[in-house]
């Protein structure tokens, strides 16, 4: 027990801090109910489960990284679409100047109400980010990508000039400024990042690293490694990619969980494919030869045909999804990775 004299000193300090910095700047955990962390769905059932809270956490920094064409931007745009469906305001800072508006619309993004910026320099991009964050009106901001946040000095300099560590210092400074504001405004920030190969690893440790220095690794609450693991074909035609997402860092739930899902060309993440994969794995969907069925009702012959049935029958898809979530929740364990799906030939 704290003696009376020290207790009065603490109360006085609390009052002074509240007066100087606002009520709630310093609280006793026992006096404040610990709130459940809000999240934004990723559009992937498996990844939402792997993240532990049903999606990416609000008020935090997220890093999505991986090799080229692995599905990083697609995953980010799916999160934007999910946020907008729930009434959120989203911004996309397109530092790469490569946003495909038509593709974003196909993924379900409300492009009419999406705030888009194509900045000229890294400083401009991060100033826009800070202004949007401090406004308190934006729920989700995506920056594509860290590698494209080129410092002004580098753009205005000559081609052969050396600018060692300039981008890393720029990122470190920006992250120090906005981390607290993001939490206060309950806004989520997603950085899309690329992979580079380290020089001189000599076989020790991973030869891969991400761009922009180490600051983002420390400030990010969640880091997701996205990789393409297989090509999906139908009648010898490539129709999409099988993608694996690994949560390599997670400050809000246990890390190192993985999820696999299909990214279909022109459509994005196949929710129906995940429902089928996890449904079979958990014995919710029956598989007899090539036929798939649920509660004695045939869904179709082959995975792709069953996906079409679920896509056309949303209530049925929602019912199976609810059963999957219920089973996973009751088991209180890491969501099992589904077996690699068979492609319809």
Swiss-Prot record:
Biological function: Can catalyze the hydrolysis of ATP in the presence of single-stranded DNA, the ATP-dependent uptake of single-stranded DNA by duplex DNA, and the ATP-dependent hybridization of homologous single-stranded DNAs. It interacts with LexA causing its activation and leading to its autocatalytic cleavage.
Swiss-Prot/TrEMBL keywords: ATP-binding, Cytoplasm, DNA damage, DNA recombination, DNA repair, DNA-binding, Nucleotide-binding, SOS response
Signal peptide: none
Gene source species: Helicobacter hepaticus (strain ATCC 51449 / 3B1)
Protein name: Protein RecA
Record GO biological process: DNA recombination; DNA repair; SOS response
Chief localization: cytoplasm
UniProt-recorded Gene Ontology molecular function terms: ATP binding; ATP hydrolysis activity; ATP-dependent DNA damage sensor activity; damaged DNA binding; single-stranded DNA binding
TM region(s), chain numbering: none
Localization annotation: Cytoplasm
Lineage summary: Bacteria, Pseudomonadati, Campylobacterota, Epsilonproteobacteria, Campylobacterales
Binding positions for ATP per the UniProt entry: 66-73
Pfam families: RecA, RecA_C
């Amino acid at each position: 027990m704290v003696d009376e004299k020290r207790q009065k000193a603490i109360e006085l300090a609390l009052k002074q801090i509240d007066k100087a910095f606002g009520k709630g700047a310093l609280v006793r955990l026992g006096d404040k109910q610990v709130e459940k962390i809000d999240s934004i769905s990723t559009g992937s059932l498996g990844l939402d489960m792997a993240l532990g809270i049903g999606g990416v956490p609000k008020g935090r920094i997220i890093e999505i990284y991986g090799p080229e064409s692995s599905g990083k931007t697609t995953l980010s745009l799916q999160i934007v679409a999910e946020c907008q469906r729930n009434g959120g305001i989203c911004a996309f800072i397109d530092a790469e100047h490569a946003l495909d508006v038509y593709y974003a619309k196909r993924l379900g993004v409300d492009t009419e109400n999406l705030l888009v910026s194509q900045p000229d320099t890294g400083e401009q991009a991060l100033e826009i980010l800070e202004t949007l964050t401090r406004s308190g009106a934006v729920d989700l901001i995506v920056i594509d990508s860290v590698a494209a946040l080129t410092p002004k000095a580098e753009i205005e300099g000559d081609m052969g000039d050396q600018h060692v560590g300039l981008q890393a210092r720029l990122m470190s400074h920006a992250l120090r400024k906005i981390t607290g504001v993001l939490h206060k405004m309950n806004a989520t920030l997603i950085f899309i990042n690329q992979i580079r190969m380290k020089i001189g690893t000599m076989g020790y440790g991973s030869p891969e690293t991400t761009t922009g220095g180490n600051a983002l690794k420390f400030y990010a609450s969640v880091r997701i490694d996205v990789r393409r693991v297989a090509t999906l074909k139908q009648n010898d035609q490539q129709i999409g990619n099988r993608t694996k997402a690994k949560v390599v860092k997670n400050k809000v739930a246990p890390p190192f969980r993985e999820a696999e899902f299909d990214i279909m060309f022109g459509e994005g993440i196949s929710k129906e494919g995940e429902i089928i994969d996890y449904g079979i794995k958990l014995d919710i969907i029956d598989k007899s030869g090539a036929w798939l069925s649920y509660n004695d009702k045939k869904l179709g012959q082959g995975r792709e045909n069953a996906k079409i049935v679920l896509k056309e029958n949303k209530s049925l898809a929602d019912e199976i999804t609810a059963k999957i979530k219920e089973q996973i929740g009751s088991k209180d364990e890491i969501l099992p990775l589904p077996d690699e799906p068979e492609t319809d030939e």
